């Protein structure tokens, strides 16, 4: 009786969305009519929606209505910024377009703003004597807290949906109220342990805030759990409010790539092989895999922000249809290179290129210089309005055109039509998704200001050459896919599952077929995989319509399969405590790798809570990025984790003449005889020539997993790098 989550568009309440939605967040006020009528009833909040942040399609629609002169009203994906806990430079404001007004107040209104402070931190998690324990008035919510805001909104929609008359009438015992018992969340496979802990805390705080906003539980009934002290299995003690309402348990047990495998395994074993795991294993196991009762499956999950590879070995106990399957994760790795990077390169080569040529044809002396000035990095004299318009160009014009081009490329293989085509500007936007005339006019004005005459962005033609698009996709992803294919082959996997929305691109299938010495039948693209009628997000032929849905459905299957599904018993307890992949820590170079000479700590085992880092130091000469990799090979791509920098500009000016500063890191103390995987500065001293002065308090080691601290290109609009 699975049902897809429905999100109601609160600024257009008759519209309900049930398809997978993007993770954009937009601050907006909600009004359901004349509030003074509910005030007269004695229930002033009868028609009040308590939150500030809209999500999904509604957030995307509201963001598209912006004209380019507003303040900060939202962002593309707060999960990218879990590490960013500093206040924003500008306060957040409410997007006023949903209600048709022109007022843009601070995003510090309503019941939700009373429960968080200016940083977005829940007040019930702060000590009573904490000076920050004040309701939000100057909303400079950290980008990390916006992930919690989004979860609160999603949880409220879920609670409202399961108790709605329309949903309950379709279920048995429709007169009984519903409650959430468990909230199952998947984790990006490559997420660092530090970010995983932040994600866990944000999810629990979101749950608590949602139930406080609904007045189902008070602050006194919330568990006194400090930030970061939650374990992966959820809270052991669930508080119960008056009336017996218990908070749902939040489960963090499965990463996205592993959950995807659960969909495949359940579909094959329970549905296609009638519960006979042994028969399925025998059919799919390679001839050179001599281990009995085992099957080795890899998942290559290509998402929007990361590409993850997970290799799991399954073995079963029992016989016939009475078996238990035991998964064991052998390998996991992730790279911050995925679908959004493909979109960015398509924008650079296929969207900005025609605009540049059209501007030169209109009389602009150098179209490339104009593009670099408009969509390059921030420069002095550009103001906030310029940055907002640039960001709106990326969201309203560049990204939709690139995605539409890629969608045409996706279907070109199935249709067999690879003929180059040319599309007009308006043809590349879906119905009702046309960009704001203000943003189009801004581009036209900038072209005219540089000498262009009779230029109109709406008249620009965009050629779509599928061969050129394929080369663009390959240039971004092929080197990474070849590296991951080497890992897949070395682990002698029997089956490779390819998931994620970008996995539908034909170039990805071609790259894998070229790099993997395997029969095509062992490479299974989950797009259009015949999964059966049990799958909630199936198409009319019972196939997986969107492969990015497999993570959510797989997590549900994984939890239910622990004794709750007939014919399919999966023991997931061995998957709950994933090990750290940080084996080598050092300084990242410009290509995202850690050279051998910049590897400061090697052969680490951060899962052993009794072992600290080696007692060795490295030189600090200026702001530097620290990351990790799990292999000794210097060419292996590394993952960014920390930024080491001066605390203030004053300290930078004072200490820079005394560099190099010798820095020694250590693991953060978690408790008696227990060490965290988090790193801290243990010691920092200036050069011998300057007297070995203590500089520990002048440096800061901050979690930062994005290269650009200012933000992702979808949030900054920076489309061209010099």
Predicted regions and their residues:
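Acidic, glycine/GT-rich loop-and beta-edge segments that sit at the periphery of enzyme/chaperone cores
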Residues: 275, 279, 289-291, 356-385, ...
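Gly/charged contiguous loops adjacent to phosphate- or pyrophosphate-bearing nucleotide/cofactor binding elements
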Residues: 82-87, 91-124, 135-139, 242-247, ...
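Nucleotide/phosphate-binding catalytic cleft detector across ATP-hydrolyzing
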Residues: 72-79, 85-297, 694, 701, ...
């Amino acid at each position: 009786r699975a049902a897809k989550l429905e999100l109601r568009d609160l600024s257009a309440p008759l519209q309900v969305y049930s398809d997978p939605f993007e993770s954009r967040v937009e601050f907006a006020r909600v009004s359901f009519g004349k509030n003074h009528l509910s005030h007269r009833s004695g229930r002033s909040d009868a028609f009040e929606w308590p939150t500030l942040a809209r999500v999904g399609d509604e957030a995307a629609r509201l963001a598209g209505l912006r004209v380019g002169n507003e303040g900060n009203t939202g962002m593309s994906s707060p999960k990218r910024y879990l590490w960013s806990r500093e206040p924003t430079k500008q306060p957040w404001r409410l997007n006023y377009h949903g209600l048709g007004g022109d007022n843009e107040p601070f995003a510090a209104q309503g019941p939700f703003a009373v429960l968080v402070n200016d940083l977005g931190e829940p007040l019930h998690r702060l000590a009573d004597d904490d000076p920050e324990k004040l309701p939000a008035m100057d909303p400079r919510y950290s980008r990390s807290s916006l992930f919690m805001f989004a979860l609160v909104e999603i949880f409220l929609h879920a609670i409202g949906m399961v108790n709605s008359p329309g949903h309950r009438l379709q279920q048995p015992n429709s007169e009984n109220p519903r409650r959430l018992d468990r909230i199952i969340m998947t984790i990006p496979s490559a997420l660092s342990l530090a970010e995983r802990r932040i994600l866990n805390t944000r999810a629990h705080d979101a749950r608590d805030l949602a139930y406080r906003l609904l007045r189902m539980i008070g602050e006194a009934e919330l568990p006194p759990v400090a930030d970061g002290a939650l374990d992966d299995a959820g809270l052991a003690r669930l508080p119960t409010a008056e009336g017996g309402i218990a908070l749902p348990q939040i489960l963090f047990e499965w990463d996205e790539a592993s959950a995807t495998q659960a969909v495949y395994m359940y579909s094959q074993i329970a549905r296609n092989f009638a519960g006979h795991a042994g028969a399925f294993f025998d059919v799919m196991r390679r001839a050179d895999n001599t281990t009995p009762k085992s099957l080795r499956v890899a998942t290559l999950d290509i998402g929007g922000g990361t590409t993850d590879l997970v290799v799991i070995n399954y073995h079963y106990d029992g016989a016939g249809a009475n078996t238990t399957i035991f998964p064991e994760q052998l390998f996991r790795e992730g790279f911050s290179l995925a679908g959004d990077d493909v979109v960015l390169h398509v924008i650079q080569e296929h969207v900005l290129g025609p605009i540049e040529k059209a501007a030169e044809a209109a009389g602009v002396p150098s179209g490339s210089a104009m593009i670099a000035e408009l969509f390059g990095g921030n420069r002095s004299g550009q103001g906030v309005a310029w940055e907002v318009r640039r960001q709106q160009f990326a969201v309203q014009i560049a990204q939709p055109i690139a995605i539409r081009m890629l969608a045409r490329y996706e279907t070109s293989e199935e249709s067999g039509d690879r003929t180059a085509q040319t599309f007009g500007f308006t043809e590349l936007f879906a119905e009702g998704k046309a960009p704001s005339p203000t943003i189009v006019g801004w581009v036209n004005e900038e072209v005219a200001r540089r000498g262009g005459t009779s230029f109109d962005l709406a008249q620009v033609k965009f050629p779509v050459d599928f061969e050129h698009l394929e080369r663009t996709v390959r240039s971004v992803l092929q080197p990474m896919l070849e590296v991951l294919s080497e890992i897949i082959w070395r682990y002698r996997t029997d089956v490779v599952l390819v998931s994620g929305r970008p996995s539908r691109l034909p170039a990805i299938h071609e790259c894998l077929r070229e790099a993997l010495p395997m029969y095509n039948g062992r490479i299974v693209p989950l797009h259009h995989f015949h999964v059966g009628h049990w799958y909630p997000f199936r198409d009319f032929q019972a196939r997986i319509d969107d492969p990015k849905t497999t993570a959510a459905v797989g997590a549900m299957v994984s939890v239910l399969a622990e004794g709750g599904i007939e014919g399919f018993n999966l023991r997931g307890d061995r998957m709950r405590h994933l090990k750290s992949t940080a084996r080598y820590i050092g300084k990242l170079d410009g290509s995202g790798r850690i050279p051998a000479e910049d590897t400061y700590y090697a052969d680490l085992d951060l899962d052993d809570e009794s072992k600290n880092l080696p007692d060795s130091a490295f030189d600090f000469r200026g702001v530097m990025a620290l990351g990790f990799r799990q292999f000794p090979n210097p060419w292996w791509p590394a993952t960014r984790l920390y930024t080491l920098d001066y605390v203030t500009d004053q300290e930078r000016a004072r200490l820079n003449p005394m560099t190099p500063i010798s820095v020694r890191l250590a693991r953060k103390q978690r408790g008696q005889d227990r060490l965290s995987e988090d790193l801290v500065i243990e010691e920092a001293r200036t050069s011998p020539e300057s007297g070995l002065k203590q500089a520990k308090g002048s440096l800061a080691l901050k979690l930062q997993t994005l290269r650009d601290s200012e933000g992702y290109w979808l949030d900054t609009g920076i489309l061209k790098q010099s």
